[in-house]
Each structure stands twice: as C-alpha cells, then as structure tokens.
Amino acid sequence: MRQLDLTECGPMSSQTQTTLSRLTPIKTRRFAFVLIENFSLLSFASAVDALRIANRMAETTLYTWLFMGEGGDTISCSAGTSFKLDGDLIELKRDDTIMLCGGINIQNHSSKKILNWIRREARRGLPIAGLCTGAYPMAKAGILDGKRATIHWENQDSFSEEFAEVDLTKSVFISDGMRMTTAGGTSSIDLMLKIIADDHGEELANAVADQMIYSSIRTDQDTQRLSVPTRIGVRHPKLSNVIQMMETNIEEPISPAILAKDVGMSTRQLERLFRRYLNRSP
C-alpha cells in the first residue's frame, strides 16, 4: 500500500487548517488503482499526485492507495516504464474506490479476468472510475448501461458504436452515481479535485490545484476542446490562425480582408485556401 510519509509534509494555510478542524474524526479513504497494460502515465500520475498533495496540505492521511493489476507482478505504462504492483485483482473493502487506468489498445487488454473482476466488485457496491480509456472495460463489463460517461476523443466514435446503451458525452469527466469516467490526460486532475472537494471542501481542493499550478479547474459541464488542426483535419498554420480568430470573434465578425492581412496574405489567397481545404468561403 502506498502511504504518505508525513515527515515530508509542508505547512498548510490557517484557512485550510480551520476547515479540516471541523471534520474530525477524519476517516481515511483508500483508492485501488487498477493498472491495465499500456495505461496512460499522465492520467494515472495526475490522479495519484492529487491525493498525495491533499494529504500534504492537510498534514494528515486523508487518502491511501494501492496499485493492482492482472497477475499482480509488474505492468507497463504508455511510456514503456514498468511498474511494480502491490497485488493481483483481489476482493476489496466495501469502502474502497476503484480507479481503472486505461490507455492505448484498451480493447486488447480488457481481459475476461479483468471484466469478471469489475462485475464482481460492482455487484458488491464499490464506486468505480475509469481514467482515460478506463470507460471501455467498464462498458464491456456492462456497468455503464444507462449511465452517462465519457472517454478520450480518439475513442468516442468506436465506443458509441459498440456501446449504444451508454449515454456517451464529450465532457472532460462525468460522475454518475457510483460510476465515474474521465476523458484522459489532465482530466484526471479535475475528477480528483471534485472528489477532494466533495470529501473535505473546496478550500482543500483549491489548495491542491494551486500546488499543481492548475489554474482552471473544469467541471463535468466542460467539454473536450480539440485544437483547430485536429478538428478540421488540416495542418495549415495560417488557416488554423484564421479559424481561431473567427471563433474568438463570433459576436463581432472580422472581415475576410482583415483576417487575410493579419496572417500575411491577400483576400484572394485566403478565399482560395478556404475553398481548397474546407470547400467554403471565409
């Protein structure tokens, strides 16, 4: 089990201290991180570190965690690094929270053993979250039927085709009852900050965000926003810049002549660029 060495704790603010003083006695909450082969290192590390920082800022052990996985030995993340696991897929305590850590090629790594384990723990009433592509084994196990969920944008189309019974959204994270899902990347931070706020108040969650230099905390109302080149399927710097300017000035549109001048081309060149790549005028 991973626990914080409290000798490493830094000071917390008097405001946070006052908030936590109203919470005694504090019950420690344990998270079981289930690492699935090729899991996203960013999504996983973001979630664990949010818990670590919460402990540090509170100067007490609010959270503990352990790392589990099929086989219980070692497992590789998306960066190719091997992680030593604390154990195999065991039966957990009823007040534990499960975090399924997915990554690339999740379809190939959602084994029958993992799916059966997910179903069993869901029947026992444990809250289960899927980080990055962790929503896939959750849906495959049937525990997202009729639930709202999200998944990384690369997997959205295939997921919606395979799991029509899941209400898929483009949100950065979703919390629907005992089921939680994230879109990957830093969206793990947003989910963990919500959990920390629900458990111990927004002051502590904000203190954790500040430590992570995370200035814009997102909610489940925020959607995955892709870059202009990804959305339009074209890697053309000037075209991307023009579209970005158009999107930020919807209420007061900029004329094509000014747009063209701002990116160093003529209006006619801009019109040709739009027709060539987007089959439309500016």
Task: Give, region by region, the residue ranges found by the protein language model.
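Extended, subdomain-level signal for the structured scaffold at the beginning of enzyme domains
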Residues: 1-128, 136-141, 193, 197, ...
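A conserved active-site-flanking secondary-structure segment within enzyme catalytic domains
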Residues: 145-173, 207-208, 212
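Structural detector of well-ordered beta-strand residues that form the stable sheet scaffold
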Residues: 128-129, 150, 169, 180
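Residues that mark the start of a beta-strand
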Residues: 28-30, 148, 178
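Conserved anion/nucleotide-ligand pocket segment
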Residues: 171-213
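Residues at the C-termini of beta-strands that transition into short coil/loop
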Residues: 69-71, 87, 153, 172, ...
